[in-house]
Amino acid sequence: MDYKETLNLPQTNFQMKANLVQKEPNMLKYWEEKEIYKKTLETREGAPTYLLHDGPPYANGDIHLGTAMNKILKDFVTRYKTMRGYRVPYVPGWDTHGLPIEHRVTTTLGEEAKKKSPVEIRKLCKEFALKYVDIQREEFKRLGVKGDWEHPYITLTPDYEYHILDVFKTLVENGNVYRGNKPVYWCPTCRTALAEAEIEYHDHESPSIYVKFQMVDQPDTYVVIWTTTPWTIPANVAIALHPEYEYLKIKVGNEYWIVADGLLQKFASETGIEFQVTEKFLGKTLEGKLTKHPLYDRTSVIVLADYVTLEDGTGCVHTAPGHGEEDYQTGLKYNLPILSPVDDEGKFTKEAGKYEGLKIWDANKVVVEDLEKAGALIKFGKISHSYPHCWRCKGPVMFRATPQWFISVNKNNLRGKVLEQIKKVKWYPSWGENRITAMVQERPDWTISRQRVWGVPIPAVKCKSCDEVTLDPKVIEHFANIVKEKGTDAWFELDIKELIPSDFSCPKCGSKEFEKTYDTLDVWIDSGCSWEAVIRSKGEKFPVDLYLEGDDQHRGWFQSSIFLATAKTGNAPFKTVVTHGFIKDEQGRKMSKSLGNVIDPMEIVNKYGADILRLWVASTDFFDNIRVGKNIIEQQVEVYRKLRNTLRYLLSNLYDFTENDILPYEKLLPLDKWALGRLQKYIEQVTQYYEEFEYSKVYNATVKYCTTELSSIYLDILKDRLYVEAKDSIYRRSAQTVLYYILEALIKILAPIMPFTAEEAYQESPLKKYESVHLENWPEVRKEFINENLLEEFQQLLLVRDDVLKALENARSSDVIGHSLDAHVKIEPKNSEIGQLLEKYADMLEDFFIVSKVSILNELSDGINGQLVTVLVEHAEGQKCQRCWKYHPDTGKDENHPETCPRCSAVLRGERK
């Protein structure tokens, strides 16, 4: 007889081979057709809302691994919180104005760009941005990210632009916006001012020069300065000393030079001079003394400043208020001229005299030559240092004094209020709080004007009579209402008379004749107003629960958002902020095209499936920088296989089981009670990890649970009961009851991380109550299933099992047995407690060790010495049962089932229930 036909062999349509690349698009279609996202909101109508507000990616290219990881992490949060019973609306957004897009458009146009009107350029920028919104939307959807993809927020829409202007109006009303001629970061390539958040630091080689300035009242004495920007020497008007530092007058040849005591040795070693110290004095004694400018017929005054350090140079700081923030502040204090003889393209203007028309970087060489001719150059060298570059064109930037609009961070104690709000926010990781606090404490006023056309216009008007430039809340409000209908193109298309209220007049001279100005707002204001445009104005929960972005946003979106929200509402826009690190390659190097180590997330998705990419994201300690490469992804494929096989085992052994077959806890066998208790501990543990955004711990706990506790122990032990015992017997139903609970928990716990695979398993499972697993509720910890005493006993039994497995392996390698079912295991406990425990559970030990017979003896003459027991393995007596493969002395005694053991023959006779 073929006894295989009498076994309860596994059955399922859930295949071992995942075929994710083929299946996932069909799953997306299913979710869309069934409107699953919409139903997650409808089924939780009236429940508390959890709001994760999406930081908008920039719409100027395909998604990269960083943006993919960011969206996947957000999806972990929203799916988990939905299953916890919250109403979780998720509105994705895109940042669509600004220099990067305009730069791409004008670069593509080349010379043609100069022939285009602002409106034509803006139209092309809009088309470009919306094209990439559509591309990125499809890519994000393919990753399995759920949300309101048909109604995203896009910063170029009239409604959104209206709210930008509305927030801006509040800042103007409060007096936080002012116009000033201040040095700002300026990109000569892109020809615009840049904010701090638009600056990147890269290594850059600069000239390094020591220059001497002759004292007017002591012609043989010189003050020595050091600079890495010789091109700024034409704008020098002062030399700054620290009031409390000690300075030395040293004799070099026939001259006397002044340098700081703390930098003398370094200076002497770099210049190779021989010197003799002749005098010592504090910096403040030289305040107000005049020196001769080495290139022009004018003087440079000695001033005092606390920012002078003893790190580099001479302690005598070259000061050009038109080319540096600290220099500028010193210039204001001493009423110095603000010289900035450089135009938008980084070329010297006629104010620079002989240097007119030279680009500043080319001027470095000429200025150095002129200093040498004038006898003022002490030493020329080169230095490689970290230097500010433009985020868009990657070129070096300069500080340049130009008329710009600023937000004062100190007016109305805005900085102080923001610092107070930062303390109220929960930061993950916790060091995020210190980081943003330090940045806010040190940040300068915010340069908000851009000399570009692709952005929200600053509705400032210039009086034709007196040239006064005015930014008035009434004009902003009037323009904002036009924008609501027509968008910000209106500023470029409509006549000035339509753009301002009819009764508006110049506050300085009373004239009613104006012309437009054409600066646009910093794009960080656009995204920084999203809490108002997307959340607060729509009546959604404010402050929102969570912002989750890369840790570069401490100086970007987090900061722009908290400043603008605090200014308008008095509150931070978020309760919690989570940040992730940056993606590196397997060697820890930054990803770059030049290194050839860039990984396209869609390549991973198209080769392996989105669930593999998502599993990789879950595996990372994302709070820090994250490594990825081909080998790391391949490792996730292996892990995925193990998780999938666990699900397959569970599904394939529940094909004939429904909720009605569940046994009450008291009827379960001890091993099943242990497994059910362990399941509760696992649920409790991973739920806590999900709450704390510790997805790598969810991943590690789940992989360990599936591969160690389930596959290697519980599921392995169960095979005999599931396949061999009678279909409806307590032995099988007890096991199936726990498998049902495990499957239910595991599918739900995996659903936020692997939504496609969890859905596939759910659709094949006896659990299915809804159209989708993503409409299910989170598994609850059922305390009544936790018997601590039993769990402790099984902890001891598992240690005994380890001893037995080692002995079985030894017996296998010695050819005593082939399979563990060939074994008769004799056990001598090392103490009475273990002995009593083994006697208590004697009935289940054969299954527990997967052997044919177990004997507990007081003494063994031979055996393997283990941790808790001594184990002797012998070949089991009797014949091998052809149905269950166990050995038994009475196998073959049933005439109707001659090749079976007593247990199997009882099952076949229908007597074992």
Curated annotation (Swiss-Prot):
Q: Record's superkingdom? A: Bacteria
* Subcellular location, record wording: Cytoplasm
Family under the similarity heading: Belongs to the class-I aminoacyl-tRNA synthetase family. IleS type 1 subfamily.
Q: Using the chain's own numbering, where are the disulfide bonds?
A: none
Obligatory cofactor(s):
Zn(2+)
**What GO molecular function terms would the record report?**
aminoacyl-tRNA deacylase activity; ATP binding; isoleucine-tRNA ligase activity; tRNA binding; zinc ion binding
Q: Which GO terms describe its cellular component?
A: cytosol
Motif 'KMSKS' region located where?
A: 590-594
The protein's predominant localisation is cytoplasm
Catalytic reaction list: tRNA(Ile) + L-isoleucine + ATP = L-isoleucyl-tRNA(Ile) + AMP + diphosphate
What EC class is this?
A: ligase
What is this protein called in UniProt?
Answer: Isoleucine--tRNA ligase
Functional note: Catalyzes the attachment of isoleucine to tRNA(Ile). As IleRS can inadvertently accommodate and process structurally similar amino acids such as valine, to avoid such errors it has two additional distinct tRNA(Ile)-dependent editing activities. One activity is designated as 'pretransfer' editing and involves the hydrolysis of activated Val-AMP. The other activity is designated 'posttransfer' editing and involves deacylation of mischarged Val-tRNA(Ile).
Subunit notes for this chain? Answer: Monomer.
Per the UniProt entry, the Enzyme Commission number(s) are 6.1.1.5
Tell me the domain comment.
IleRS has two distinct active sites: one for aminoacylation and one for editing. The misactivated valine is translocated from the active site to the editing site, which sterically excludes the correctly activated isoleucine. The single editing site contains two valyl binding pockets, one specific for each substrate (Val-AMP or Val-tRNA(Ile)).
Sequence motif: 'HIGH' region, positions: 57-67
As to how many cofactors bind and how, the note says:
Binds 1 zinc ion per subunit.
What Gene Ontology terms for biological process does this UniProt record contain? isoleucyl-tRNA aminoacylation
Residues annotated for ATP binding in this entry? 593
InterPro entries (UniProt xref) = aa-tRNA-synth_I_CS (IPR001412), aa-tRNA-synth_Ia (IPR002300), Anticodon_Ile_BEm (IPR033708), Ile-tRNA-ligase (IPR002301), Ile-tRNA-ligase_type1 (IPR023585), Ile-tRNA_ligase (IPR050081), M/V/L/I-tRNA-synth_anticd-bd (IPR013155), Rossmann-like_a/b/a_fold (IPR014729)
Gene that codes for this? ileS
Give UniProt keywords alphabetically: Aminoacyl-tRNA synthetase, ATP-binding, Cytoplasm, Ligase, Metal-binding, Nucleotide-binding, Protein biosynthesis, Zinc
**Amino-acid positions noted as binding Zn(2+) in the UniProt annotation, renumbered to this chain:** 881, 884, 901, 904
Q: Which residues make up the binding site for L-isoleucyl-5'-AMP?
A: 549
